[in-house]
Amino acid sequence: MGSDTSESNNDWKTQLNIPKKDTRPQTDDVLNTKGRSFEDFYLKRELLMGIFEAGFEKPSPIQEEAIPVAIAGKDILARAKNGTGKTAAFVIPTLEKVKPKLNKIQALIMVPTRELALQTSQVVRTLGKHCGISCMVTTGGTNLRDDIMRLNEPVHILVGTPGRVLDLASRRVTDLSECHLFIMDEADKMLSRDFKVLAEQILGFLPERRQLLLFSATFPVTVKEFMVKHLKNPHEINLMDELTLKGISQFYAFVEEKQKLHCLNTLFSKLQINQAIIFCNSTNRVELLAKKITELGFSCYYSHARMKQSERNKVFHEFRQGKVRTLVCSDLLTRGIDIQAVNVVINFDFPKTAETYLHRIGRSGRFGHLGLAINLINWNDRFNLYKIEQELNTEIAPIPSQIDKSLYVAEDSSAVPIPFPLESLPITANAPQQPANAEPLPPQQTQVQFHAPPQQQQQQQQQQQQQQYQQFPNQQQQQYGQPLMPQNYQQQAYPPQPFPSKGFPQQQYTQAPQ
């Protein structure tokens, strides 16, 4: 009798639309667990269905530690590495605690950037698609009137950036009287000088009886002050035995500024890149570099804070879909952005602080997988390189002439998962959402297809490369015409032909600066 009941209880699992298993090797960052399963947390079946259909198999260490404590109602201060499953660690208990029949905002998730708000809201919708829970995302740069109209409909979970959330609360448009769960992702940024006052003002609109969950990879003094003031006997989780992810191999190339573009082109021709993110230190250099990369024959998008929100959304979503291999951006996308297909991060401009460096390289090697971080440094960066190595207690090695592919390349590229159906990604913040009872969307192919151009076009590209690579960077005030947006880019061959008889200029940048 008992076995029959057990079999009937597991029948629902056979009906799930589970995606292809991710067969890539993983590191102890996500494998060093106590052996629990998601069923051990006694989650409701509808939530378990969403978890398994999203491709989750076992909880990561941060999920294992945080989920039962959050469900129990305790405040949490959690510190874990980038890319180890922090988002699901607070989304899962949130979905478990929210009551679908109560048409009030019951949970508020605050994040520092608009892209992270869109991503987090989609994770909520994906994991909770069988729960009958409504999630709304609200960020600056979108139409306020649309948000006000959306709030006339039932909303259970609100995801947003601090400025817009405070604006809606101050106008008394958002009813937070039943919002007993307040979550801050990237809490160190949320409690920085830019956002701390806003966060404390928002707390004033929440009920006295509330639960606070703070998640981040780094916790400066400002977070400690906030914790003492607002958290009640919090449960502290610290899974940071070391700061950098174990699966990321870090190298530096010592190269003169005028040779950086040549070096970048050589890297493109030598590395096996699935997708790459290239970071620059200013918006001007982001646009300039994206223009130059496109002229070299690579398909390339760029994103920075001065772009319109609709353009940023389009770039972000199309890059996630694999429309291009390369994204050039400022530090706008260093926080929390989870793109599983990214296996290479290149710091075209070396960051000034260890915190920025940590968040940048964390865009590769997501969820315990392998990744590669390459830093192009010049003579002026040598002190920052040493300082960051000391602060993070890590080694950034000189780049070898050949990088072992096993350090960053998955044996089966088709195993790279997409965290949620890409067709459901909204271009605007509050596009109409798919009904909870709708048929599941078909799984996406994650391989990026590129078609080689004719041989004559390849030769022309190669000639252009030889003429152009030495021209970067010229005067930054030089006009390069209108910036190219995604609809204007053409898919190009990948990789283009390398420079004839030119490999890495080893004598220039593989030796440490004296």
Curated annotation (Swiss-Prot):
Q: Position of motif DEAD box? A: 185-188
* Broad class of enzyme this protein falls into: hydrolase
Q: According to the UniProt entry, where does the motif Q motif sit in this chain? A: 36-64
All copies of the Helicase C-terminal domain together span: 247-407
Q: Name one GO cellular component term.
A: P-body
Q: Which family does it belong to?
A: Belongs to the DEAD box helicase family. DDX6/DHH1 subfamily.
Q: What protein name applies here?
A: ATP-dependent RNA helicase DHH1
Q: Which organism is it from?
A: Kluyveromyces lactis (strain ATCC 8585 / CBS 2359 / DSM 70799 / NBRC 1267 / NRRL Y-1140 / WM37)
Encoding gene, per UniProt annotation: DHH1
